[in-house]
Structures are given as C-alpha cells and as structure tokens.
A protein has these predicted regions:
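Substrate-binding pocket helix/loop in short-chain dehydrogenase/reductase
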Residues: 122-135, 249
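Short, small/polar-rich loop/turn modules that mediate ligand/substrate recognition or access, typified
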Residues: 205, 210, 280-282
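Canonical Rossmann dinucleotide-binding motif of NAD(H)/NADP(H)-dependent dehydrogenases/reductases
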Residues: 16-54
Length: 301
C-alpha cells in the first residue's frame, strides 16, 4: 500500500483487462476486425464475430470469405475464449439484430460493441452507387450494429466505432487523392459517424454506457494493399504495384511511417473497452501517426 492505494503487485494473479465480458465485432473475418477480436479474447472476452464474407460490386478489391471468419474463431479459441460466428450483412438491420440476439443467447450478455466493418471503394470513374454503398456500409452499418446491440447493454458497457482520419479532412482530396464517388461516400460516412458518436455518447452517458470513436490512418490490411488504393496514391501510373505506392503512403502521416499495424488500433479498442476507460466517453481518439496534425491547424483546446 502506498499513500492509501494498493499496489498492482499486491493484487495477486493478473486478470485480463476485459475478463468476463462479451464483445461483438463487425467485419471480424480479417484485417482490423480480426485483430480486435483476437486482442479482446487475449484479455478475457468472449467474441461474437460477424462479417459479410462476400464481395460488394462497387468495391473493387475482394472482401473476406467464410473461411476467414472461421480462422478468426480459431484464433479466439486459441486464446482460451469462446467464439460465436455468423455471416451477416451490417446493411441488413433485421438479419444483423438476429445474429446478435443469437450470440447473446449463447453467451448470456453483451458488454462491448466494436463497429468495425467498412469498405473503401476508392476508384475514380465508378457510378454513383459507389457513394451509396460506402455510406450504407460505413455509416448505416455502424448505426445498425449499435442500435441492434442497445437492448443488451447495461451500465458499464462500451461502444467503439472505428472511424478514419478521413473524418477530419474536408474531403478525400486533401491529400491529392481522387477517390471518385466511392471515396466521397467514404469520407462523408466517416464524418457523419464521428458526429454520431459525439451526440449519442451524450445521450448514453446518463445510463453509464460509454461511446467513443477510434480514427486510424493507413493500416496494414487488405484494404490498404489493394489495386484501387495503389492507384489513388500513384495516379501517374496505370497499374501501380505495392512497391510503387508504398513510398508515397507516408504522405498522410506526420511520423515517417507508411502505415500502422492492426494491433495498434486494437490496443486503443482494448483500452476503451476496459474499465480503465470507465470515465472516457464521446472522444475521437486518433491513432494516426500525426496525420491529423498535417491537415488541421491548431484551433485551441
């Protein structure tokens, strides 16, 4: 005991930071979603993992497959936790709600909501449907997951929305990237999701339910390493490769890195999900290697 506080060393065997909790993660089959599910499981949470596991026509790069979701479940179970998986489209409120209900029936509770599913149809020349698809997944999908989870949440629950550094840019063209209608839809969706977190967090606060957003920069996932993203960063080339595009990736960060790892985002998710963040709500946490600092001048605290 030191100044009235018990030292960590005196508390006995360490427990995971989310031991005994249950988390639902959308877009859990691969990339950031898999990383979030695995890290939460490593810290003691059981996982309800949902994913579309199919492609979307205007999104040029391939999305996850059922076997990817199975692998996420295997990794969760390898951490000693239970996994409930279901193929579900975040754009379909009824189907998503039913999937969550089944997961909660299996595990008995729901404490953590991670709205991670997203697409980035960042290809110039696509039809207007690309804007609609980006908004339907990246904004409506967030609302559907959160609203379908509400009836299961009690005081102490934590909702985390995975946004994007694009939420703090005036448009996708801030960095010289022409993303077409899909890129514009992506930026709009992320801006709107950030505003949603701010306003809904205030409404949830009196129920002791917390809500925060995490805004990554480039993340080392399949979304970044895709043909449309390479073309966005190297519009001077017809068919740029990773080797062509990667030297340009650092343009959106202040720190000299091309991207961050999925685990860097998962660490923020884990913190916000844990009781260590019990009084943190309504925040826009940027894990962006200083990207925000490059596009937004200081305007006071």
């Amino acid at each position: 005991v030191w100044f009235g506080f018990t030292s960590f060393a005196a508390k006995g065997p360490a427990m995971g930071r989310v031991t005994g909790k249950v988390a639902v993660v959308s877009g859990a089959a691969r990339g950031q979603g898999r990383s979030h599910a695995r890290m939460l499981a490593a810290e003691g949470a059981d996982i309800i993992a949902v994913d579309l596991c199919a492609d979307i026509e205007t999104n040029e790069y391939p999305l996850a497959r059922p076997e990817d979701l199975d692998e996420t479940a295997r990794l969760v179970e390898k951490e000693g936790q239970r996994a409930f998986t279901e193929i579900a489209d975040v754009r379909d409120r009824a189907a998503l709600s039913a999937a969550i209900d089944r997961g909660v029936a299996e595990f008995g509770r729901l404490d953590i909501v991670v709205a991670n599913a997203g697409i980035c149809p960042l290809t110039a020349g696509l039809p207007p449907q690309a804007f609609a698809d980006a908004v339907d997944v990246d904004l409506v999908g967030v609302l559907n997951l959160v609203h379908s989870s509400l009836k299961h949440l009690q005081a102490g629950a934590s909702i985390i929305v995975i946004g994007s550094n694009a939420a703090f840019m005036s448009s996708m063209n801030t960095t010289g990237i022409d993303g077409g209608p899909g890129g514009a839809g992506y930026a709009f969706a992320k801006i709107a999701a950030a505003h949603y977190v701010n306003d809904f967090a205030l409404a949830l606060a009196k129920f002791s339910i917390r809500m925060n957003a995490v805004h990554p920069t480039n993340v080392n996932t399949d979304m970044l390493h895709s043909a449309p993203m390479y073309r966005a960063f190297r519009p001077d080339l017809k068919n740029p490769t990773r080797e062509d595009a990667e030297p340009v990736f650092p343009v959106v960060q202040a720190m000299p890195v091309p991207y961050v790892e999925p685990e860097d985002i998962s660490e923020a998710v884990l913190f916000l999900a844990s009781d260590a963040a019990r009084y943190i709500t309504g925040q826009q946490l940027r894990v962006d290697a200083g990207g925000f600092l490059k596009v937004k001048p200081w305007s006071g605290a």
